[in-house]
């Protein structure tokens, strides 16, 4: 049966748009079906980390996103008296991904940057007002019925990706269940436009007050956000009332400094799909997992999904890699994702304590940890890939490969491009890579390795002898070296394989 596209993506949010761009960059024909008639204009996600920015860099949107975002140096947890419990410091510094660790964003601006980038690829089309309905996977591809403003359409694709949010119709139709991780708390979110920034906190804050746990964070594009926990006995209608919201904001003394743009009640949940793949149907973003917002990793997790999935889909569709390559998607992402959710739950339980004595015990425990020097000063890193497409016994396999930044501001990825890299010590004098050689050499020294093979999603396939790495990669993927990206200059021929 003739295909209309290689990949049909249900959902035109950050995950779906990023995946579409990364696929189009690799030569695939992509259709994005977004059910809403127009882009959602109000804020939602507020944070992207360094790894998320690196993924947006490959998608051609990072500079635009960076220009509209804000940096914040501290993330403070305060008790009911305003005393410091815990501080994550220096989160505005450059992280391993080559961008600041914390970037406070305005989601509509992020999506606008991604839509502009998508327009550069004629084989990638975003359709608003297209709602995915039923679909049939016959093993060779997926036939999907879509409701459009012009009437029903049928789209034939090799793969269907459900990036259609927490209520994902694709997930439901595929019969995929959620594993509930036992965190469910209702909160009121209040987003404001800022007229006088000097009257607002300069740090991100978690107010661990048992009377009313509260979050206060910066956002991009001249905005700020408060989140107030909804207490037992309160209703969504009650807490959304203008007068009630005004009483919540009164202690912050921001009257006249801000204007309310949006208020909404959300239930913060922790859930993960028990399967991320059902034949030629795969899930990504909130359709596959939901993370409480306390670690700021909701959007970031969806971007990681897109980065992991894009190169594998392209390898299968375009380069003849085995379909089983896609079976590595969930094992690789799920462990990292569970660690992300666990951290968010831990932070959430610390913040969401509403029992006075429980809060006192928490404060004492944190205080003792600070005295003993056992208190972290930044969020812990996420685990390496432990199973999947890696040489498991190889040093540093599955770890995240950093992106050095040259003295002139050039980033490694922009020089070497997309695809798989084979970096060895004897290549570090090549002109394109010379500005980054000291950082790469230190990385190899620390791991006592002669070479590293870096996957297209910038995770380490393995370290060791260059010839052995190349052979192992070809055996694992069944890809010919030429299929992993043609060299763009003679000096790069041995780097990009």
Sequence positions of predicted segments:
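Active-site-adjacent segment of FAD-dependent monooxygenases/related oxidoreductases
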Residues: 44, 49-117
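A conserved short coil-to-beta-strand element within the FAD-binding core of flavoproteins
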Residues: 128-142
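Glycine-rich FAD pyrophosphate-binding loop
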Residues: 24-44
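Core beta-strand elements of the Rossmann-like FAD/NAD(P) dinucleotide-binding domain
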Residues: 3-5, 150-159
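Conserved FAD-binding catalytic core of PHBH/FMO-like flavoproteins
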Residues: 116, 159, 163-268
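FAD/FMN-dependent oxidoreductases across multiple families
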Residues: 237-301, 321, 326, 343, ...
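Helical substrate-recognition/capping region of FAD-dependent monooxygenase/halogenase enzymes
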Residues: 1-6, 10, 26, 35, ...
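N-terminal Rossmann-fold NAD(P) dinucleotide-binding loop
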Residues: 16-17
């Amino acid at each position: 049966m003739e295909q209309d596209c290689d990949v049909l993506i249900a959902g035109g949010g950050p995950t779906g748009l990023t995946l579409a761009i990364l696929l189009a960059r690799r030569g695939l024909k992509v259709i994005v079906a977004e059910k809403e008639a127009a882009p959602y204009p109000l804020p939602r996600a507020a944070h992207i980390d360094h790894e998320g920015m690196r993924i947006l860099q490959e998608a051609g949107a990072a500079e635009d996103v960076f220009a509209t975002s804000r940096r914040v140096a501290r993330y403070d947890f305060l008790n009911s008296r305003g005393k410091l419990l815990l501080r994550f410091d220096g989160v505005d510094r450059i992280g391993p991904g080559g961008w600041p660790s914390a970037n406070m964003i305005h989601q509509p601006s992020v999506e606008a940057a991604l839509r502009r980038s998508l327009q550069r690829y004629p084989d990638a089309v975003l359709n608003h007002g297209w709602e995915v309905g039923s679909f049939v996977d016959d093993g060779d591809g997926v036939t999907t019925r879509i409701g459009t403003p012009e009437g029903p359409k049928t789209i034939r694709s090799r793969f269907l990706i459900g990036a259609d949010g927490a209520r994902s119709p694709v997930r439901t139709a595929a019969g995929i269940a959620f594993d509930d991780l036992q965190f469910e708390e209702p909160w009121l979110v209040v987003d404001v436009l800022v007229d006088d920034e000097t009257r607002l906190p300069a740090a991100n804050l978690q107010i661990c007050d048992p009377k009313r746990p509260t979050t206060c964070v910066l956002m991009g594009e001249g905005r700020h956000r408060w989140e107030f926990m909804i207490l037992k006995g309160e209703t969504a209608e009650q807490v959304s009332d203008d007068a009630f919201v005004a009483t919540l904001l009164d202690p912050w003394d921001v009257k006249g400094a801000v204007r309310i743009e949006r208020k909404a009640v959300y239930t913060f949940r922790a859930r993960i799909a028990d399967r991320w793949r059902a034949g030629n149907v795969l899930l990504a973003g909130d359709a596959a997992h939901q993370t409480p917002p306390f670690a700021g990793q909701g959007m970031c997790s969806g971007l990681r999904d897109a980065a992991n999935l894009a190169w594998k889909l392209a390898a299968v569709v375009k380069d003849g890699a085995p379909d089983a390559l896609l079976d590595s998607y969930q094992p690789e992402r799920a462990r990292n994702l569970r660690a992300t959710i666990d951290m968010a739950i831990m932070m959430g339980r610390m913040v969401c304590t509403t029992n006075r004595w429980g809060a006192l015990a928490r404060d004492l425990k944190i205080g003792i940890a600070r005295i003993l020097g056992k208190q972290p000063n930044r969020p812990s890193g996420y685990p390496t890939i432990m199973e999947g497409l890696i040489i498991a016994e190889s040093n540093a396999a599955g770890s995240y490969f950093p992106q050095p930044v040259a003295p002139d501001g050039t980033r490694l990825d922009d020089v070497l491009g997309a695809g798989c890299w084979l970096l060895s010590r004897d290549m570090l004098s090549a002109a394109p890579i010379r500005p980054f050689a000291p950082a790469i050499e230190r990385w190899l020294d620390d791991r006592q390795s002669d070479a590293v093979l870096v996957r297209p999603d910038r995770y380490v396939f393995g370290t060791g002898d260059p010839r052995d790495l190349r052979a192992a990669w070809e055996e694992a993927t069944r890809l010919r070296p030429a299929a992993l990206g043609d060299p763009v200059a003679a000096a790069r021929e041995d780097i990009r394989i």
